[in-house]
Regions:
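NAD(P)+-binding Rossmann beta1-loop-alpha1 motif at the extreme N-terminus of oxidoreductases
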Residues: 1-62, 67
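Residues at the starts of beta-strands that form the adenosine-phosphate
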Residues: 4, 29, 116, 143, ...
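Rossmann-like NAD(P)-binding element
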Residues: 58-88
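Redox-cofactor binding/interface segments in oxidoreductases and associated redox assembly factors
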Residues: 69-70, 95, 146
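Rossmann-like NAD(P)(H) cofactor-binding subdomain of soluble oxidoreductases
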Residues: 80-132
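Internal alpha-helical scaffold of NAD(P)-dependent oxidoreductase catalytic cores
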Residues: 136-222
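Interdomain hinge/lid region at the active-site interface
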Residues: 209-276
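Conserved small/polar residues in nucleotide/adenosyl-binding loops
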Residues: 281-283
Length: 283
């Protein structure tokens, strides 16, 4: 197991990783690097005093970091990769928690970066951002998708898998392309729909606003909860996986238009047939 772990980007996901590692293994040292100027104060207030803050990534060698987890928004990856590549990381494995993989793999391969990179994506999270909202148990019984690059060492892949399993995660290996196709449907499009629905509700008359909150059922509340996710993170996800999301968006709009046509025509038979068919689907 790793001895010295650096978490780059110490938000909700990063702090949850730290909490889980600290609870399960008292001997592992945890380091954090983040652009937040008050990081050390916030970490201490969050009862994470075992986490040491690095002022610069140049301290990686001095601290004998053997495992790096990138937990930043994805548009920051390119800058981070460049900095990591300037450091001798032959004995270090780098992974990430990003929600898209094709774009990240492309950057790594095109720039011919040399550090040992094993992309991963823990399918876990809550809508609240910030290290204060992290908690131990976030990853328990959740899936983590590992997306090895062609030149990835099996030894390194297995070490990354072992690490995530130590946090009680289930792991699955996929190609970057397959990962992005699956997640565009199960996560990215639903988030886009949530934002769109809440925007639609916000544009209704002001007089309706209080009633929307008062009489919203579970479904609408779920949409508003999802729409409350970290804006910067989701902007990056939408842009990074835009081609897959745009294809699905077109399909989704077509389905909405068909529902609208049936409603306009009062076509009870078509509506009932479609709804009955969908009622048989259980995921």
């Amino acid at each position: 197991m790793f001895k010295n772990i650096l978490i780059i980007g110490f938000g909700m996901i990063g702090s949850s990783i730290a909490r889980s590692v600290i609870k399960k293994n008292k001997s592992i040292k945890i380091f954090a690097f983040d652009k937040s100027p008050n990081l050390k104060i916030r970490i201490n207030k969050s009862k994470l005093k075992r986490v040491k803050v690095l002022k610069s990534l140049n301290e990686i060698k001095d601290q004998n970091i053997d495992f790096i987890i990138i937990c930043t928004p994805m548009l920051q990856y390119q800058s981070i990769f460049k900095k990591l590549n300037d450091i001798d990381l032959q004995q270090t494995i780098v992974t990430d928690v990003g929600s898209t993989k094709v774009n990240i793999e492309k950057i790594y391969i095109q720039k011919k970066y040399q550090f040992n990179f094993i992309p991963s994506h823990p399918i876990a999270g809550i809508e609240k951002a910030g290290l204060e909202n992290g908690f131990d148990g976030l990853f328990t019984n959740r899936y983590n998708i590992i997306c090895p690059i062609k030149k990835s060492s099996k030894i390194h892949i297995n070490k990354v898998i072992k690490f995530w399993k130590s946090l009680n995660m289930k792991t699955e290996i996929m190609s970057a392309k397959e990962h992005d196709k699956v997640l565009s449907l199960t996560s990215h499009l639903p988030h886009l729909i949530s934002y769109s629905l809440v925007l639609t509700a916000m544009k209704k008359e002001t007089s309706l606003n209080s009633k929307l909150v008062k009489f919203s059922a579970g479904g609408f509340r779920d949409f508003t909860r999802v729409a409350g996710s970290d804006p910067e993170m989701w902007r990056d996800i939408f842009l990074a996986n835009s081609s897959q999301i745009q294809k699905l968006t077109s399909n989704f709009i077509s389905e909405l238009k068909e529902f609208s046509r049936n409603l306009n025509k009062g076509n009870s038979h078509n509506l009932l047939t479609k709804l009955k068919k969908l009622s048989l689907i259980h995921i």
